[in-house]
């Protein structure tokens, strides 16, 4: 079964919430390390907006009739990282529900970040 999730985040909404408050709520430890390295405030906002949109889209894609492990539903247990070519990928070390593959695309403008996620839930092993 394949599911799709999409989310759009307005960057000025993050300004209202507060960058550091949102970072503490949604970023994994790996993402937080990347966030702290970013010096430009606008780049920090864009980074947060992309991660927030990605995780919202991911959770929307998880809304299936099957039971999802509660550890899969915590923002901080998921990392949206980038490979050597800059392409985003999804990482989770705590989720016991197995999804493969998880495909993700993130785009942004000066005002918005949008993420699209496609997940395929594999059947659980009967052994």
From Swiss-Prot:
Catalytic activity as recorded in UniProt: apo-[ACP] + CoA = holo-[ACP] + adenosine 3',5'-bisphosphate + H(+)
Gene3D superfamilies: 4'-phosphopantetheinyl transferase domain (3.90.470.20)
Subcellular location(s) of the protein: Cytoplasm
Gene Ontology BP term (one): fatty acid biosynthetic process
HAMAP family: AcpS (MF_00101)
Family stated for the protein in its record: Belongs to the P-Pant transferase superfamily. AcpS family.
Reported function: Transfers the 4'-phosphopantetheine moiety from coenzyme A to a Ser of acyl-carrier-protein.
UniProt-recorded name of the protein: Holo-[acyl-carrier-protein] synthase
Naturally occurring in which organism (per UniProt): Onion yellows phytoplasma (strain OY-M)
Lineage: Bacteria, Bacillati, Mycoplasmatota, Mollicutes, Acholeplasmatales
């Amino acid at each position: 079964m394949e599911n799709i999730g999409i989310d759009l985040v307005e960057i000025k909404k993050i300004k209202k919430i507060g960058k550091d408050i949102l970072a503490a709520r949604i970023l994994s430890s790996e993402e937080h390390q990347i966030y702290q390295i970013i010096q430009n405030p606008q780049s920090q906002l864009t980074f947060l907006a992309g991660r927030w949109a990605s995780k919202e889209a991911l959770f929307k894609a998880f809304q299936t009739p099957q039971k999802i492990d509660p550890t899969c539903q915590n923002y901080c247990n998921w990392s949206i990282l980038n490979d050597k070519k800059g392409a985003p990928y999804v990482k989770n070390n705590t989720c016991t529900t197995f999804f493969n593959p998880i495909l993700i695309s993130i785009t942004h403008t000066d005002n918005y970040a949008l993420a699209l996620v496609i997940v395929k839930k594999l059947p659980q092993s009967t052994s």
